[in-house]
């Protein structure tokens, strides 16, 4: 009796594991944060244009809370996730053995927007000002702490208001003098309102990005240390696939925008805009054949925007502009590479915020450039 | 002599067995708790999930003591309790009085029911952010979320309870020339009390949800905030401590209502000898 | 108290706005201190008659009066008792009996004095602090009776007060009621469906026809008081019962 039961159990587990294994070789989940958005364009390009498939992955995307992404990857429930470096430090301090293997955002995306009469920005002016922030958590809060620290200020020197993700409204209503924002998004919306005379008596704004002051580690690809040790080939293939998708997105944002349409339901897609984008994408593909330099490609992106702005209303173009500004945060000579100094800067900020105890964490084990080096050209 | 001794022994034996069984029965709720703890310990020992996802009981116990000593738990607990207290008073007050009015005036039910049903069938989590915008990120919005979630069961139970008052007893009160206040105080109130208290049990446990939902929306203080903040700091034991604290509040409130039932509804425990 | 019905008619509204005649026209006079039983086929409007006298039901036409004063609502001097003991389950025996006094604003000490004085007559002295759930049907009905008596009413209106009790209890409690009545001498109008009970207790038995109830017989009961249970074997008793039964079910009908 016991034997039969044992055999039944064993065959049950064999079936289970074979189902699991089969799914494993085909399907791969990548865990993202936030919601589907144009800022995840490299993943949409990677799926739509076969960058993942060429490395043997059939990728599905899921959006979760950042701590959940981290725990699921750390527990081996999912192999790949995208989180910010700050979360990696915090989670490692609490026993999650994850490794950051590919730096996606080369620049920390947070900054502070404030009224400026002459276009100049001086952080010291923040003293006694009312500053809006989504909340005392996440990248906005660590970004603000770093900025204040870099200006020799602290949270006590300003009046901090939790305003949720409503910076353009609250700022233009005059309820705050400055606001912590994502530099690739809100400043764009505020500038449009200023231009339309729809932002109170604000004539000019200035943005100080964290990246302009301190190099802080930002979003990147994480895997569990276990996976990195057990199956480095798989990690390498994912790093290569993402690298190739990211590069394609940077090089041809028109094509990337088109590829994102299927994934981001709310993305503006008027026929006129799409037709124009298709033409631009085809022209860009030809241009890329000529092996242009990074600077030349950056210039071609600006040209695209000028061309589009002439033909399409500016409201429909906002998301494309967000994409271009976000690309500026990704672009670098060597994509994916992470510096120890940016990790140290982040760790200092976290300690300043009281989120990290004083014993220094082993930051060099938090990340690895091994898989970036391993990407074949 | 030996016979007698034997008999005595068996009697003693059977009595002690009976006492043991009685004690087992009395302590059975405690036993289920112990069993739950054992199962939890077993699960963590089996390492199906790593400790950072399912921490062992001991780690949670440590986190509890630490959170207690640092004052962190009590600080956020008192915030949540205050919101719940005022939310309960507001929600029950409105629910009981509107419920009574509806029970007495059917036309009111006809007029109000679409609003009330719509209100009830909309999940509070969906519009809690709006309440925060309307009532600010301070305690008021959390008091309102609590009140809203508590309101409905107290309303429905009040209507049902007042409608269920025996028409014969109403006749009796009329024949005795009772004033409306006397009818309320001597007939409707005691007659409706069992059902209203049953509704209060539901409301009491829902109040915790109301306050915590409000705290999830605005980050600041309270157990809802503590759970998010612990989660963001990857402190799973503290997450569990906070969740268990919420459970404890709900259970205490529930027990408090049971106590009220015990005191106020003593007559229900009486029956023919 | 003298009770009088003059050309009383009571109709009920039906859901389709029609009118369902329930009672009358009927005229009847009950002298002070008289014990009148009302019998009739079920649905003849006996209960409606009692409820109208108690001021719980409005007359459609005609009038009801107590001591020649029209009855338009409940009176403190006119107490009604129902078939169901109708006790408040959350009140003890003494608090149930004392309810009318409490509603009338009598203070606790005087209320308790009045109630405790009644308890022995009701055979409830050992149940003062019991709750209704702990009482038998007969005892519950005694409590209901106590609640009526304690008001010291001038007239008692009893709507099948013992209808839900078993035969033995019913007989016993009927005679107890007669004892109480002999002591206080209120006017009593009692509805019953038991002809033996009616003849045994009443000075007059009034027979109503089927709906809408009209007066078909008014039979004087010439039996001496105090009544006793063995009277039911007397020839006079049996004749009166036969006479009453014939009025309810006419042999030629």
Protein language model regions, located:
Chain A
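Bacterial N-terminal signal peptides that target proteins for export
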Residues: 1-9
């Amino acid at each position: 009796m016991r034997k039969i039961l044992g055999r039944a159990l064993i065959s049950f587990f064999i079936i289970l594991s074979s189902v699991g294994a089969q799914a494993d070789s085909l399907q791969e989940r990548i865990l993202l944060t936030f919601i589907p958005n144009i800022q995840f364009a490299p993943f949409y390009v990677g799926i739509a244009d076969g960058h993942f498939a060429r490395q043997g992955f059939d990728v599905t995307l899921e959006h979760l809370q950042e701590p959940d992404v981290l725990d699921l990857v750390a527990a081996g429930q999912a192999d790949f996730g995208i989180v910010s470096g700050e979360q990696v430090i915090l989670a490692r301090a609490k026993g999650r053995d994850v490794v950051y293997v590919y730096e996606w955002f080369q620049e920390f995306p947070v900054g502070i927007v404030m009224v400026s009469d002459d276009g100049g920005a001086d952080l010291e002016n923040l003293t006694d000002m009312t500053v809006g922030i989504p909340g005392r958590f996440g990248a906005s809060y660590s970004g603000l702490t770093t900025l204040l620290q870099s200006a020799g200020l602290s949270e006590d020197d300003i009046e901090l208001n939790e305003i949720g993700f409503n910076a353009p409204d609250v700022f233009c209503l005059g309820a705050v003098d400055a606001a912590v924002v994502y530099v690739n998004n809100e400043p764009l919306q505020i500038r449009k309102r200023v231009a339309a005379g729809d932002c109170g008596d604000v004539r000019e704004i200035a943005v100080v990005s964290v990246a302009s002051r301190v190099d802080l580690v930002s979003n990147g690809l994480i895997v569990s240390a276990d996976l990195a040790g057990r199956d480095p080939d798989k990690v390498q293939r994912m790093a290569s696939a993402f690298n190739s998708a990211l590069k394609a997105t940077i090089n041809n944002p028109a094509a990337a925008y088109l590829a994102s349409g299927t994934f981001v339901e709310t993305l503006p897609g008027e026929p006129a805009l799409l037709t124009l984008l298709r033409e631009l994408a085809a022209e860009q593909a030809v241009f890329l054949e000529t092996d242009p330099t990074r600077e030349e490609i950056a210039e071609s992106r600006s040209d695209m925007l000028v061309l589009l702005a002439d033909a399409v209303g500016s409201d429909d173009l906002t998301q494309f502009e967000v994409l271009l500004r976000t690309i500026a945060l990704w672009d670098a000579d060597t994509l994916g590479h992470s510096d120890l100094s940016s990790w140290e800067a982040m760790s200092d900020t976290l300690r300043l915020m009281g989120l990290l105890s004083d014993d220094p964490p082993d930051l060099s084990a938090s990340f690895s450039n091994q898989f970036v080096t391993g990407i074949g050209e | 002599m030996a016979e007698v001794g034997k008999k005595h022994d068996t009697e003693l034996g059977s009595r002690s067995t009976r006492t043991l069984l009685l004690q087992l029965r009395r302590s059975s709720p405690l036993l289920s708790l112990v069993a739950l703890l054992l199962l939890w310990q077993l699960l963590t020992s089996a390492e199906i999930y790593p400790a950072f996802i399912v921490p062992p009981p001991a780690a949670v116990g440590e986190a509890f003591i630490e959170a207690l000593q640092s004052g962190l738990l009590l600080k956020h607990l008192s915030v949540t309790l205050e919101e719940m207290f005022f939310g309960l008073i507001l929600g029950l007050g409105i629910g009981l009085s509107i419920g009574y009015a509806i029970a007495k005036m059917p036309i009111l039910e006809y007029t109000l029911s679409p609003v009330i049903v719509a209100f009830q069938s909309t999940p509070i989590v969906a519009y809690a952010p709006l309440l925060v915008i309307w009532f600010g990120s301070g305690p008021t919005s959390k008091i309102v979320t609590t009140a809203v979630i508590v309101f409905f069961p107290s309303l429905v139970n009040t209507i049902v309870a007042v409608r269920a008052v025996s028409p014969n007893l109403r006749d009796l009160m009329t024949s005795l020339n009772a004033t409306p206040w006397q009818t309320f105080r001597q007939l409707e109130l005691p007659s409706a009390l069992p059902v209203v208290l049953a509704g209060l049990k539901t409301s009491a446990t829902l109040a915790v949800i109301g306050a915590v939902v409000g705290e999830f929306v605005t980050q600041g203080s309270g157990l809802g905030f503590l759970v998010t903040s612990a989660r963001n700091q990857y402190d799973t034991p503290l997450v569990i401590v906070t969740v268990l604290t919420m459970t404890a509040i709900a259970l205490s409130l529930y027990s408090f209502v049971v106590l009220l039932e015990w005191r106020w509804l003593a007559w229900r425990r009486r029956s023919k000898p | 108290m003298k009770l009088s019905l003059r050309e009383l008619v009571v109709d009920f509204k039906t859901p389709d706005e029609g009118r369902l005649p329930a009672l009358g026209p009927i005229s009847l006079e009950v002298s002070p201190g008289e014990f009148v039983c009302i019998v009739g086929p079920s649905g003849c409007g006996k209960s409606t008659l009692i409820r109208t006298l108690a001021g719980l039901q409005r007359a459609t036409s005609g009038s009801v009066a107590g001591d020649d004063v029209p009855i338009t609502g409940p009176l403190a001097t006119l107490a009604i008792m129902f078939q169901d003991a109708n006790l408040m389950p959350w009140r003890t025996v003494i608090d149930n009996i004392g309810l009318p006094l409490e509603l009338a604003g009598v203070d606790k000490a005087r209320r308790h004095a009045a109630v405790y004085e009644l308890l022995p007559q009701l055979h409830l002295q050992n149940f003062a602090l019991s709750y209704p759930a702990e009482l038998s049907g007969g005892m519950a009905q005694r409590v209901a009776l106590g609640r009526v008596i304690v008001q010291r009413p001038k007239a008692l209106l009893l709507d099948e007060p013992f209808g839900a009790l078993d035969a033995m209890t019913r007989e016993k409690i009927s005679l107890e009621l007669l004892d109480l009545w002999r002591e206080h001498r209120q006017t009593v109008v009692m509805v019953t469906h038991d002809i033996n009970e009616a003849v045994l207790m009443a000075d007059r038995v009034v027979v109503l026809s089927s709906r809408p109830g009209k007066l078909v017989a008014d039979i004087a009961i010439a039996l001496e008081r105090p009544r006793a249970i063995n009277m039911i074997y007397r020839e006079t008793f049996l004749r009166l019962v036969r006479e009453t039964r014939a009025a309810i079910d006419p042999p030629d009908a």
